[in-house]
């Protein structure tokens, strides 16, 4: 993506996990992202039906997938699964996928929810979507950094 389309794009971001997939929505023009929903990762059919429903509702121009890494930057057990998920999204829905290093997204998400006094079960349920928001915000911030006008 380049030019005007990248700047006014609607984006969906995913924090892929074996049990849950956090989803966030954002806009490249306003550089804003918000936690959207958590998909229960029950099986492939359920996962892609839920994603398909979100894509139909939000009609994003591109997708962002968090890539889990160890703190030193080496691949993690989940790195390959997240990559496979992103490749499947691209193949199934034909939208461009960008991977974002998500090393500290869950830590940031937890801190953000704590700051807003979200507690207990509500915090546990929102954590994955909030992690997706952090991933998407990182991506949007990188877009800003690359646009030196």
Curated annotation (Swiss-Prot):
<keyword id="KW-0540">Nuclease</keyword>
<keyword id="KW-0378">Hydrolase</keyword>
<dbReference type="GO" id="GO:0004518">
    <property type="term" value="F:nuclease activity"/>
</dbReference>
<comment type="function">
    <text>Could be a nuclease involved in processing of the 5'-end of pre-16S rRNA.</text>
</comment>
<dbReference type="InterPro" id="IPR037027">
    <property type="entry name" value="YqgF/RNaseH-like_dom_sf"/>
</dbReference>
<protein>
    <recommendedName>
        <fullName>Putative pre-16S rRNA nuclease</fullName>
        <ecNumber>3.1.-.-</ecNumber>
    </recommendedName>
</protein>
<keyword id="KW-0690">Ribosome biogenesis</keyword>
<dbReference type="GO" id="GO:0000967">
    <property type="term" value="P:rRNA 5'-end processing"/>
</dbReference>
<dbReference type="InterPro" id="IPR006641">
    <property type="entry name" value="YqgF/RNaseH-like_dom"/>
</dbReference>
<keyword id="KW-0963">Cytoplasm</keyword>
<dbReference type="InterPro" id="IPR005227">
    <property type="entry name" value="YqgF"/>
</dbReference>
<comment type="similarity">
    <text>Belongs to the YqgF nuclease family.</text>
</comment>
<dbReference type="Pfam" id="PF03652">
    <property type="entry name" value="RuvX"/>
</dbReference>
<dbReference type="GO" id="GO:0005829">
    <property type="term" value="C:cytosol"/>
</dbReference>
<dbReference type="InterPro" id="IPR012337">
    <property type="entry name" value="RNaseH-like_sf"/>
</dbReference>
């Amino acid at each position: 993506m380049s030019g005007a389309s990248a700047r006014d794009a609607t984006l969906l971001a995913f924090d892929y996990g074996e049990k849950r997939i956090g989803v966030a929505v954002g806009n490249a023009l306003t550089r804003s992202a918000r936690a959207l929903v958590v998909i229960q990762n029950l099986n492939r059919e359920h996962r892609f039906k839920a994603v398909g429903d979100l894509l139909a509702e939000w009609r994003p121009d591109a997708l962002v997938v968090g890539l889990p890494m160890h703190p030193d930057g080496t691949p993690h057990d989940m790195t390959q699964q997240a990559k496979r998920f992103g490749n499947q999204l691209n193949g199934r829905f034909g939208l461009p996928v960008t991977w974002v290093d998500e090393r500290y997204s869950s830590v940031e998400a937890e801190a953000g929810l704590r700051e807003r006094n979200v507690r207990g079960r509500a915090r546990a349920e929102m954590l994955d979507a909030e992690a997706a928001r952090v991933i998407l915000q990182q991506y949007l911030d990188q877009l800003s950094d690359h646009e030196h006008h």
